């Protein structure tokens, strides 16, 4: 699916360059695409206060990138499979390949599609009061602010643009966490990625809380002082000694505090898209 969305992103960009047609019956080449995307439904009953388990779903999006319109078939399960069909969706371009979605007939709906990052997210509330947030299996935060304090308590580092990715699977109690692009100044290492395969999490009304201790990780890094061509090295020396993270889907917010082994503590905040934090 990610390859399909990346291909669509390239086609979307090409359509912008050649100025796609605005005919009443546009062809696929005119910028009309249909994508049936596997997604994860996060559900919360606003009437009873019950937080429901995650479920797999497929949501169908048809978007006309020339006319900035779309239609959606959103599938959710509340005892039985049900659908919310929106035929009057406005697809407002915010930047190349990124569209903010809204519906004049359904004020409870909002969302976005980002062909650049192969990402979609839909928010809606059903007539029965079920709040549904549909996300890709991977929930990521592209822009963050990070303060890294070292164990001698005398130094710290401020970093932006560290990326966080969380993968949730229905029926599983553990998530996959990946931290990308973080520098450990004291150990002179730049980490391409630090990956933890089994991070315990709970589902909340707004998203997820991830928490654990001594969580094994696999880290890929290069030296920050070696200016020669380097081969990426792998280490398991930076487990998450402590890990406490709030992923707030409803408000698109990340709040994280974790330890890289015993040598550094990271405090991170951020959002998926800082320019469009409120969809």
Question: Where are these predicted regions, by residue range?
Answer:
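Tryptophan-anchored aromatic micro-motifs
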Residues: 26-55, 136-161
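Bacterial Sec-dependent N-terminal signal peptides
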Residues: 4-6, 14-40, 129-140, 256-279
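Extended lipid/amphipathic-ligand handling interfaces
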Residues: 58-64, 88-92, 111-115, 162-169, ...
């Amino acid at each position: 699916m990610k390859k399909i969305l990346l291909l669509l992103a390239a086609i979307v960009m090409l359509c912008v360059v050649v100025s796609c047609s605005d005919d009443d019956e546009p062809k696929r080449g005119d910028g009309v695409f249909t994508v049936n995307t596997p997604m994860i439904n996060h559900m919360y009953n606003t009437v009873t206060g019950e937080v429901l388990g995650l479920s797999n779903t497929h949501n169908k999006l048809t978007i006309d990138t020339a006319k900035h319109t779309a239609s959606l078939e959103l599938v959710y399960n509340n005892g039985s499979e049900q659908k919310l069909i929106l035929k009057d969706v406005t697809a407002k371009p915010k930047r190349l390949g990124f569209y903010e979605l809204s519906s004049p007939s359904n004020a409870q709906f909002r969302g976005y599609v980002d062909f650049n990052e192969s990402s979609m997210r839909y928010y809606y509330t059903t007539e029965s009061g079920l709040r549904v947030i549909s996300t890709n299996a991977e929930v990521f935060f592209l822009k963050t602010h990070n303060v890294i304090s070292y164990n001698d308590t005398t130094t710290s580092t401020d970093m932006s643009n560290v990326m966080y990715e969380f993968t949730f699977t229905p029926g599983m109690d553990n998530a996959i966490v990946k931290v990308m692009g973080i520098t450990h100044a004291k150990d002179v290492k730049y980490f391409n990625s630090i990956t933890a395969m089994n991070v315990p999490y709970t589902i909340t009304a707004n998203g997820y809380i991830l928490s654990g201790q001594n969580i094994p990780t696999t880290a890929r890094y290069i030296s920050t002082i070696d200016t020669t061509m380097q081969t990426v090295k792998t280490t398991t020396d930076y487990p998450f000694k402590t890990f406490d993270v709030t992923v707030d889907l409803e408000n698109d917010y990340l709040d994280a505090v974790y330890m890289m082994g015993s040598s550094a503590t990271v405090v991170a905040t951020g959002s998926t898209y800082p320019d469009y934090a409120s969809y």
